[in-house]
A protein has these predicted regions:
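Short hydrophobic beta-strand element within catalytic cores of glycosyltransferases
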Residues: 42, 241-243, 258-267
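C-terminal alpha-helical cap of glycosyltransferases
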Residues: 321-343
Length: 343
């Protein structure tokens, strides 16, 4: 008898970004470290995600046909997993009913009590606004709530928080998610480059304007494009970062990088505002008029206020300790053994 087998079911691409699939891989890394066999089942994941999965010893299975419904779940079941971990808002009731009909144990990663699941063995909400009352309809499920369970990729965890460096100009990273759905990278980079900073611009693997962004950055003297293979190191080496308000918020907090978090989707509102209250990010609604001007002003104010920046660094390191993925893995193992351990 081989090791237990967990299947991560999550999608990523230009329309929905890469947050769901990347944080699912962080869960997978935690389970691999505990001796599990892990695979990712996805529909249309970009090559960069598949490389990340391979580097983490996580296999990949392509889901064909319509994603998120009963037919999708039937394909999942044929892989014979011991546990399915589902992350995404498009998985409907027929998807979960199919899993239940096959008596397939499943857990869900959720943000705002939007999951359509009815009988998960475990629910993970890694956001600081998460409360047990949001999941009262799952009385038998293990609940993992809050930043104690923040999912950090191994590449980030292995770098760890660094010491601040004295620089002539502060280094600023711009990283608006895997796909930049509101097309903010170019406008924000142009505004931020007007400040006396060393600007680094990340281009997400699902960003459809990658070549245009690269060409624009080449025209700016104090800007350069980030090598995607060194993204985690670039984030860790940054003095400040302007980022999409998704899971990168937790990575930057752990690494001690003060951030300006741009809300680019409705499902980020509650989590990013709670993070703002926690003190390690300054949130801006990227859907509002002229977010690039607001981001430039916020960045300028942060650079000019070292006491505030230091407080944000301390708040981030206090809030995210880097052990979330392992805690989630241990809790999943316990839930499969029938021993709920709510956190």
């Amino acid at each position: 008898m081989g090791p237990p087998f967990a299947l991560l079911r999550a999608d990523g691409g230009p329309a929905i970004g890469l947050g769901h699939v990347m944080r699912s891989l962080a869960v997978g890394e935690g389970l691999v470290e505990l001796g599990w066999k892990v695979a990712l089942a996805s529909s249309g994941a970009p090559a960069a995600v598949l490389r990340a999965a391979e580097a983490a010893s996580i296999d990949h299975h392509q889901i064909g046909g319509p994603s998120g419904a009963g037919q999708d779940a039937e394909q999942v079941v044929t892989l014979r997993p011991d546990l399915v971990i589902v992350d995404g808002y498009h998985f409907d009731t027929s998807f979960y009913r199919t899993l239940e009909g096959h008596r397939c144990a499943h857990a869900v990663i959720d943000d705002n009590s939007e999951t359509k699941a009815s009988e998960p063995i475990l629910v993970l909400n890694q956001n600081s606004h998460a409360q047990a009352s949001m999941y009262a309809r799952f009385p038998e499920a293990t609940l993992l709530l809050g930043l104690r369970f923040a999912l950090l990729r191994r590449a980030v965890r292995e770098i760890g928080p660094g010491e601040s460096q004295e620089r002539i100009r502060p280094r600023v990273l711009i990283s608006i998610g895997g796909s930049d759905p509101l097309d903010l990278t170019i406008s924000i980079a142009r505004e931020a480059a007007q400040l006396d900073v060393d600007l680094r611009v990340a281009i997400g693997p699902s960003n459809c304007r990658g070549n245009e962004i690269r060409g624009m950055v080449e025209t700016i003297d104090n800007a350069s494009v980030v090598d995607p293979r060194a993204y985690a190191a670039e984030l860790a080496a940054s003095d400040f970062a302007i980022i999409g308000a998704g899971s990168t918020l937790w990575e930057a907090a752990y690494l001690g990088v003060p951030t300006i978090g741009l809300i680019v989707a409705e499902n980020q509102v509650s989590s990013s505002r709670a993070a703002n209250l926690d003190g390690f990010t300054h949130t801006i609604d990227g859907r509002a008029p002229h977010p690039e001007a607001m981001a430039k002003t916020a960045l300028s104010e942060l650079i000019a206020d070292p006491l505030r920046s230091a407080a944000m660094i301390e708040a981030g390191r206090r809030s995210v300790d880097g052990l979330g993925a392992r805690r989630v893995g241990v809790a999943l193992v316990a839930a499969m053994d029938g021993g709920p351990e709510n956190g």
